[in-house]
Amino acid sequence: MTATDTVLQASDLTKEYRSTDPPTPGLAGVDLQVAAGEFLAVMGASGSGKSTLLQVISGMDRPTGGRVQIGGQDLAALGDAQASRLRLTTIGFVFQQAHFLRNLSIRDNILLPALKATPRRKKQVLARVEALLTRFGIEDLADRAITEVSGGQLQRASICRALVCEPEIVFADEPTGSLNSQTTREVMDALTEVHADGTTLLLVTHDPTCAARAERVVYLRDGRLDAERTLGRWSEATARDREGELLSWLTGLGF
């Protein structure tokens, strides 16, 4: 893997929570590369450091030590305004609980942040928003408030918002954690489609069925990358075999 095809490079990342005595380690020397166009899943038991890793590599939290580069930019070298802009334009986010403003429609919740993040004219951004709403099957819900749609529909709106500025990488943090099995499948179908279009995707999940969609899975234990498994490209035809392979591997790790 060369620097030119690496979207995310994390080197010797450490994170300590110094509010405790002695300090509690969150990350302990993590090295991670994500290639352009790759779908990577991060797994691990509760408290293994999955969420801490995502917060640090996305720039939402600073590491105690180590280095993070996204799109060739060193996060430590960016000022607050630059880091904020990076998170709006270079990175897309899909969280377990979608963070939308209750007084705005689905369309405006996607449109307004994008207008702040991009120099494009409103007409161009709106066209992009409408295209994404249609692509993910929620164009008929665009004028509704977030309280009027289901959890799965809201997550598809989150995916639209994550993609509207055409980011280099999308971070999905337990995006199906509060959904039923059918809706989980629909959201994962949408994320798999996003990856199929060439978008780099990093998924944090506790669900092996979701992780089986990824090309590569890394396993965190006590803040360290403990193991890694390559699955290759996902297809519907091989889904059951992939899930079985991944479950067997995870069982061997004590998951």
PLM feature spans:
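Catalytic Walker B motif of ABC-type/P-loop ATPase nucleotide-binding domains
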Residues: 170-173
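Conserved ABC ATPase "signature" region
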Residues: 73-74, 122-141
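Conserved ABC transporter NBD signature motif
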Residues: 66-74
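Conserved catalytic motifs of ABC-family nucleotide-binding domains
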Residues: 166
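Conserved ABC ATPase signature
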Residues: 145-149, 153
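Short coil-to-helix segment of the ABC ATPase nucleotide-binding domain corresponding to the Q-loop/switch region
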Residues: 104-113
